[in-house]
Amino acid sequence: MNKNEELDEDELLKKCIICPPVPKALKKYWNNRYNLFSRFDEGIWLDYQSWYSVTPEKVAVAIAKSVVDFIQPELIIDAFSGCGGNTIQFAKYCPVISIEIDPIKIAMAKHNLEIYGIPSSRVTFIQGDVLDTFKSLQFAKDYRSLVFMSPPWGGPSYSGKTVYSLNDLNPYAFDVLFKEATRISPYVAAFLPRNTDVKELAAYGSIHNKPYITNFLFEGYAKAICCYFNMKGAIARKI
């Protein structure tokens, strides 16, 4: 990358970071900013999409503690890592490979990790398509690894559906993601909408490997779920 390209990327990054006054559509997320990142005022970077898609900090902490307590992973693969909400918490326990297709979000994630004091050596960022990247991560089979997936839900409109189908995930349906993830590790966790069809999720388990679901509540309202596969015991935590 030459100097002009670096300047262009810096300029694009500055344009993508949402600063006050925030757009009207993001006001409720702005009012909730300290739940997204407790250290927000230290300079957290978020683009428009990240405001409504990042995992709230307490939820990310609970997920990280659950999987670490249960399987003590040597490596965590954070698919669809975005601006780093989950990566920050995972990296406190073990090395992380973060997969994100958007270079702007990767730049934001690296910055946000610095704010939380995460050494750059702790996280390997891979810019690319998740399924293509999964194929290059077969070495992870040699480690006690976890594949964590927080695929795009399709924006805030998901909440208007009575039941959210796993086929509505974009760009890949859940069955495709799950198949490729389990080729890397038997331990898989998926962060999904609160109204996800649990009957569809149950189809990915068996008598000996039932999926376990944590329902995350905020101020008494369900916000999202995390489904754990092959991890009996990685259950609900108070947040």
Curated annotation (Swiss-Prot):
Enzyme class, broadest EC rank: transferase
Catalytic activity: a 5'-end (N(7)-methyl 5'-triphosphoguanosine)-ribonucleoside in snRNA + S-adenosyl-L-methionine = a 5'-end (N(2),N(7)-dimethyl 5'-triphosphoguanosine)-ribonucleoside in snRNA + S-adenosyl-L-homocysteine + H(+); a 5'-end (N(7)-methyl 5'-triphosphoguanosine)-ribonucleoside in snoRNA + S-adenosyl-L-methionine = a 5'-end (N(2),N(7)-dimethyl 5'-triphosphoguanosine)-ribonucleoside in snoRNA + S-adenosyl-L-homocysteine + H(+); a 5'-end (N(2),N(7)-dimethyl 5'-triphosphoguanosine)-ribonucleoside in snRNA + S-adenosyl-L-methionine = a 5'-end (N(2),N(2),N(7)-trimethyl 5'-triphosphoguanosine)-ribonucleoside in snRNA + S-adenosyl-L-homocysteine + H(+); a 5'-end (N(2),N(7)-dimethyl 5'-triphosphoguanosine)-ribonucleoside in snoRNA + S-adenosyl-L-methionine = a 5'-end (N(2),N(2),N(7)-trimethyl 5'-triphosphoguanosine)-ribonucleoside in snoRNA + S-adenosyl-L-homocysteine + H(+)
Activity modulation: Substrate inhibited by S-adenosyl-L-homocysteine.
Transmembrane residue ranges: none
pH dependence: Optimum pH is 8.0.
InterPro entries according to UniProt: RNA_cap_Gua-N2-MeTrfase, SAM-dependent_MTases_sf
Taxonomic superkingdom: Eukaryota
GO biological process: 7-methylguanosine cap hypermethylation
GO molecular function: RNA cap trimethylguanosine synthase activity
Quaternary structure annotation from Swiss-Prot or TrEMBL: Monomer. Interacts with mug174; both proteins are required to maintain Cajal body integrity.
Its biological purpose: Catalyzes the two serial methylation steps for the conversion of the 7-monomethylguanosine (m(7)G) caps of snRNAs and snoRNAs to a 2,2,7-trimethylguanosine (m(2,2,7)G) cap structure. The enzyme is specific for guanine, and N7 methylation must precede N2 methylation. Required for pre-mRNA splicing, pre-rRNA processing and small ribosomal subunit synthesis. Involved in nucleolar structural organization.
Protein name, entry field: Trimethylguanosine synthase
Organism: Schizosaccharomyces pombe (strain 972 / ATCC 24843)
Gene that produces this protein: tgs1
